[in-house]
Amino acid sequence: ITHSKEYDTPNMRKLGLSCIDGADYLEKSDNIVGSYGRMQEASKGKDTTIGHWEIAGIVSENALPTYPNGFPKEVLDEFSKRTGREVLCNKPYSGTDVIRDYGEEHVRTGKLIVYTSADSVFQIAAHEDIVPVEELYKYCEIAREILVGEHGVGRVIARPFVGEAPNFQRTTNR
């Protein structure tokens, strides 16, 4: 894109983009009115939450925990005990794929679909007709209370969905 003849960013150049080391493909601007520089990650963690913290000036000495093999039994046991519901999945998954693969069983059994991703996140998917959104939010609050210390994930996310198999759809109620 940057080598295209149609790439024209006069305002960004005026702010200093063309003066950053490595941006020699841009025409230099004479009257720079902004501050500029090249940044490098400093935090140990590399997920979305840590990145946002770092943009705000907080450098994290420790990475947030991730769960490439799913969450530990003790976490899920406590979650099930406090919510009164068993869980399905417990592994890294795409949000659309997880409801495709586990949605019918969730609707049939009422078990919550718990999954993660490459980031430090605990996600709970549930059909809105089986688990109303407010109840799903309560389950997220319970998960957040459990997920502290060693298992203090960056985010706990509600992932409500609607519809019928095989056409489940995630909603914006999250």
Q: Predicted segments — roles?
A:
Residues 1-109, 115-127:
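Active-site nucleophile/metal-coordination loop of metallo-enzymes that catalyze phosphate/sulfate
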